[in-house]
């Protein structure tokens, strides 16, 4: 029997958001194997996802690298794919539909658009709404696309909690990728000092940096959570967020994790996008939005934290 391929290269936040859709696709194709094509940094994490039968790594080398593209094409042919759910909907995956995984049924933004509808307009809708519409167009029931269950992605972190907190804690993510510096609020160090002062050190302030963020984290006057002097893995990261009393973050992957774990917290937004478009707000997890993140004061953020924590 032929198999199903889902494409979602990343980022971490995008993969978290796609988790419900992946579950819906697997539930719909119970008797078929479902594989995920993704980027290498997420392959180990997603290989533990119970809704997948396997993970295929795409190194996403330049398209002029014909040797790599031929190798990828030959590899995918061996999986006997009959349908592709393109949840990445990028120029790269559009290229794949034409030259790498041809002659199979594709579900993508382009196959979802209504008559006369432009992709640029469609892409303004909330991401989970778009995912739901795309799956429904293929007849897939969407019980979990907007009801994401991350219970499979947690692990026992009692050892780390004993080392760094031992009780309730506030978890901060003041980081963002190098290419998305406009998402970064510049006053986290000052905020940490004010939280400690205002709450009289009631809550340890924890930071969980990625490998390239450890030096930055060490300058922020919080407790830097490491595992054997290395950044924690994704399941440990999710578990730290899950156990936190409150989460404060830039618009990054951990924000989406906190949202879908229904944690109390704040995500700080500038004008780069909207909270609605990335489907991040809920009853407990709220966005503070300003035109320019440099204009968002420590006092405003602290006031919101106090009102939500008390």
Regions found by a protein language model. Give the residues of each.
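Conserved nucleotide-sugar phosphate-binding/catalytic loop shared by glycosyltransferases and other
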Residues: 33-66, 223-226
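A short, glycine/small-residue-rich beta-strand->loop->alpha-helix junction that serves as a flexible
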Residues: 7-19, 45, 177-186
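Nucleotide-activated donor-dependent transferases that construct or modify glycoconjugates
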Residues: 1-12, 172
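Active-site donor-nucleotide binding/catalytic segment of nucleotide-sugar enzymes
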Residues: 149-216
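Nucleotide-sugar donor-binding patch of glycosyltransferase catalytic domains
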Residues: 108-109, 121, 228, 256-310
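Short amphipathic alpha-helix
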Residues: 12-27, 41-44, 191
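Conserved nucleotide-diphosphate donor binding/catalytic pocket of glycan-assembly enzymes
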Residues: 56-149, 169-178, 272-275, 281, ...
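Donor-binding and catalytic core of enzymes assembling or modifying cell-surface/extracellular glycoconjugates
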Residues: 187-266
């Amino acid at each position: 029997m032929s198999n199903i391929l889902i494409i979602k290269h990343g980022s971490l936040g995008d993969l978290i958001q796609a988790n419900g859709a992946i579950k819906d696709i697997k539930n719909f194709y119970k008797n078929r194997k479902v594989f995920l094509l993704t980027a290498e940094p997420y392959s180990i994490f997603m290989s533990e996802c119970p809704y997948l039968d396997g993970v295929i790594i795409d190194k996403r080398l330049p398209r002029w690298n014909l040797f790599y593209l031929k190798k990828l094409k030959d590899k995918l042919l061996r999986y006997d794919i009959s349908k592709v759910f393109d949840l990445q909907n990028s120029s790269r995956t559009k290229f794949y539909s034409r030259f790498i995984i041809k002659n199979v049924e594709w579900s993508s933004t382009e196959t979802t658009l209504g008559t006369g509808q432009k992709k640029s307009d469609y892409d303004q809708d909330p991401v989970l709404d778009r995912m739901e519409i795309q799956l429904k167009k293929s007849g897939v029931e969407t019980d979990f696309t907007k009801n994401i269950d991350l219970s499979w992605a947690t692990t026992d972190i009692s050892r780390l909690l004993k080392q760094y907190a031992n009780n309730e804690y506030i978890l901060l993510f003041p980081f963002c990728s190098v290419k998305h510096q406009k998402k970064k609020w510049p006053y986290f160090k000052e905020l940490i000092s004010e939280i400690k002062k205002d709450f009289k050190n009631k809550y340890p302030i924890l930071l969980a940096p990625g490998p390239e963020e450890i030096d930055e984290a060490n300058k922020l006057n919080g407790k830097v959570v490491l595992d054997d002097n290395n950044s924690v893995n994704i399941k440990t990261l999710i578990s730290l967020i899950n156990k936190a009393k409150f989460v404060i973050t830039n618009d990054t992957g951990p924000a989406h994790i906190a949202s879908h774990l229904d944690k109390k917290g704040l995500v700080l937004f500038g004008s780069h996008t909207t909270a609605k478009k990335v489907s991040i707000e809920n009853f407990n997890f709220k966005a503070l939005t300003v035109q320019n993140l440099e204009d968002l004061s420590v006092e405003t953020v602290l006031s919101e934290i106090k009102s939500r924590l008390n």
